[in-house]
C-alpha cells in the first residue's frame, strides 16, 4: 500500500489559467497570479450567461422547475426540488407524508449518483495514474483489495482490466487523454501501481453503477436526467405506491448501496492514506448548510441533516439564519453595485470583456452575513458532526481514526474528499431506512401523494 508523501513544491512566478475547469458540469475558468509558488491573486470566472432568471420572467411558476433543472445534467433534480419548495413556501401548502418520502428517496439516490460520479469520474485523475496500472501485479492488487473490502477480488478481473487498458493506450486513440501532462509518472502522483490498478478498475465499474443510481431516480421520477414528477403540494407518480415499483427501486438501491460500502469507501481510505499532505492544502474557513431530508417541508429544523454555519474553522456549529444570505454583483458582468436578498435580486447583464480584473464573471457572489462560505459535503458533514448527528459522528470518527487525522484536518482538500465519501455512506444507510418507513406507511393504507 502506498505511503504518505509530501507534495512537491513549486517556486513558479507568473499567471496560471485553467479553462475550462473540468471538475464541474458547467463553464468555469480559473485565473491566478502566482509569486514564488504561492497564489497572490485569484479570480473565478463563470464564462457562460445562462439567463435563467430572465427566461423565467412572466412564466407560470408551476413550470419553473422544468427550466431550472436544466442548469445541470448531473445534479438536475435538486434544482427542480428547490424551485418546487419555493413555490410551496409562497402558497403555504402542506405536503403528504408519502410525497415527502418519495422526494427524499429520489434525493438520496441523487446524492449517491453525484458522489460516485464525482469521486471516480471527475476527481480520480487528480490522484490516480492510469498508465501506472499497467505495471501492477494483479495478484498483489487482488490481495490488497480483499484486505480493505468485504467483497472478494479476483486477480483475473484485474488482469482483464490491464488488458483493456493496454489496448486503449496502444491504440493511440486517447480522446480527452491525448497529450495529457498527468499521464505517466507525474511527481504529484503517490499511489503505487497496484493501488492505481484497483482505482482504475473501479473507475470503469462506477460507470455502470452510476447508471443504476440514475435508473433508481427514474423509477419514481419518471426520467433521468430532469425528473418529471414534482408538483406544488406533492408528487404525481401514483405507480410509486405499487409493490412492483417499490421493489424495482429497492433492487437498484441495494446494488448502489453495496458499491458504496464495498468499493467507494475502501477506495477512499486507500487513497486518503497516501495523500495525507492534502490536509495542508485547499482549506477554507467558513461553511454553511441548509440541511436536507426533511420530515416536514415547512420546517428547516425537521431536516435530518440540520442547517447550520461554521466560522473561522472553529469546531462549533452556529444557528443558520436564511435572512443573512445576500447576492453581490460588484465584480460580475451585471449592472450596478447594489447588494440584494436572493428574492429581491436583479439580473441585468452588462458584459465588459474577458480579462477585466474588476468585473470578470457571469457568476453572482452569494454571501452569508457578509462572508464567503463553502457549501456542499464538507459543510454538511461538519455541521452534522458538530451538532452530534448520531449516524454521522461514528462514521466521521472512524474515518479520522483510520487515516490518523484530527477533526481540524477536515478543513482541507483531503477533508473535503473524505466528507464526500462520509456523506455518501450515511445517506446510503438513511435511504434504506427511509425506504422501509415508506413501505410501512403505504402498507398501512396511506395512498395520498398530492
Q: What label would you give each PLM region?
A:
Residues 2-450:
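Active-site bordering "gate/hinge" segments
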